């Protein structure tokens, strides 16, 4: 989608954003990672590139969590001001420049789970706006906790609780009987 829009792309993934470490309370490791990652993006930002996170968790870390953890770090501040969630970025392009022709309808309904890490960015339901760009899209929205919570849903001590928390969201998805299930 970005290439079709004429966006010049450079892929740069130095390492994990550290969300799993943050969820485990390891602020020291998150800080170390944040400093390394932010510094690695400075030259791209200085060349005029925006930084686009492909997951809402990573966008949340770069835009909000890292600046709270290391508020005096200039590289982190610069990155936070130039980082975007992928949905947010494409929706902004569509509003400001329009999208190239060629978007085709999908066969069947779409169930969209608005992830907590997406909602925490206070940017609105950009993933819903993005999906609405698909002609004739039939979208049902799930605004309930999935219970996953990063590592919370997969760790043995909390797995059953996570399943219990996520059941209402799963039921809502099943009820809409979609062809596609996506999460922001």
For each feature predicted by the language model, list its residue ranges.
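Iron-sulfur cluster-binding electron-transfer modules in prokaryotic oxidoreductases
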Residues: 1-184
